[in-house]
């Protein structure tokens, strides 16, 4: 009888010390970033010995993409994932992975990540945030409702922008930028608010972009932008050292898995676009040279 009481007391103490983190995710549950985050959350929860539970909230259900960074920083959400280059105003380094044609392969993207990571982590720490991991999207391509054969075809094209780099690209190519979050892409194309964008084959597939009159995907391999997962430092400091170490280990595994998933999506999602009836291919050499010159101008 005394043993039963003792076990109950120990269990109640453990439960009292247990932490619950709500993880804000901007993208739908079927997106590989969200699926990877869900697996990370599950693994952390299982390996914490009851000390930490992470509950994921995909599809902007807890906070929308543009709200997640601030929500985690202020502690409204303990953990969240955010598209890094949308945060250029917070720290210009967060936008380095969206510098056009600076990194046009996964190898170069990893080199760029390794070169910038330490300073990014330091900058986030100063803002009360702990960096866990980052995963790239597949190579960014150009989507369009109409065929693009020359620089003139870009003039006045209503273009979806999501950070300062894409706004600048629009300005340098004569396109008309409109700021649209990923969750609003389908609506923006269906209403005619935009008619072109630069984003990954994954985003196009997940939003079924072909249902909104988008017929062309041009694989220009413009850049490999990343999502990062961050934790509120106050929430982090409530964990004991062993739990923190375990979370970091799982974060490293999630990062490795995420890069693999991204590489798979780079091939498979372009095939999905083609299977849905879209024209998938490259732009002509003169147009590719024009885009690369834009990248040099922005460097």
Question: For the regions a protein language model found, what residue spans apply to each?
Answer:
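Short, basic/polar N-terminal leader/transit segment immediately after the initiator methionine
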Residues: 1-3, 20-21
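N-terminal secretory/targeting leader peptides
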Residues: 18-110, 116-299
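Bacterial N-terminal signal peptides
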Residues: 3-12
